[in-house]
Amino acid sequence: MECPKEIVLLMHSYFDGDLQPEGEQQLKEHLRSCAACAAHFHELKKTVAFLQYAAHVAAPPSFAAKVMEAMPKERKTARLRRFLHRHPLLTAASLFLALTLGSLASSWGERGAFSVSADEHVIIRDHTVIVPKGETVKGDIVVRNGSIRIEGTVDGDVTVIHGKKYMASAGQVTGEVEEINQVFEWIWYNIKERFNRALQSIE
């Protein structure tokens, strides 16, 4: 004989504590007459009692620490990979900076040909740019792989890369005079130049 499904639902309600008194009476009457349902009810009762007992069992205080010690240690490469995935913008900026600094440092080692940015009112002799006495050069002068001797006036900045500057007592420069002979000075100069060019293109 198959028991109706409502008896199983009554059992569940009983263990949940939601069973009304009339439902409890109906369940008890059925359990007296059906041995299979009584056995099932008894098994459920044992299971509920076991779960209630197990809920009060606590792990030893050092259990979590011992489990963490027993776990395999995380490799440094996994930690680095996780950091790179969590911070993509920082990773991209760092990579860009490293490549930029690397290219600037490598271009420092490549000593190119002599060049000068101004050719009016100057004399060029054996990789030396001379601003003659009584002459005024308007604008900035950049000398690469050579030297500059200022006897006149420069109305702007003077930058010497891989070279020397010589100032006569009568020579004047209205702007800054900068000698770049080290790699870090070269990198800083290029960063400033690129930044100034970017600002000029925005304007």
Swiss-Prot record:
Example GO biological process: regulation of translation
Processing and modification events after translation: Is processed by three successive proteolytic events. First, the extracellular region of RsiW is cleaved by PrsW (Site-1 cleavage) in response to cell envelope stresses. Next, it undergoes cleavage at an intramembrane site (Site-2 cleavage) mediated by RasP. This cleavage uncovers a cryptic proteolytic tag with conserved alanine residues in the transmembrane segment, that is recognized mainly by the ClpXP protease, which completely degrades the protein in the cytoplasm and leads to the induction of the sigma-W-controlled genes.
Extracellular side of membrane: 104-203
GO MF: metal ion binding; sigma factor antagonist activity
Listed transmembrane segments: 87-103
Highest taxon, organism lineage: Bacteria
Main function: Is the anti-sigma factor for SigW. The presence of RsiW leads to the inactivation of SigW, and its proteolytic destruction to sigma-W activation.
Protein name as catalogued: Anti-sigma-W factor RsiW
Species annotation: Geobacillus kaustophilus (strain HTA426)
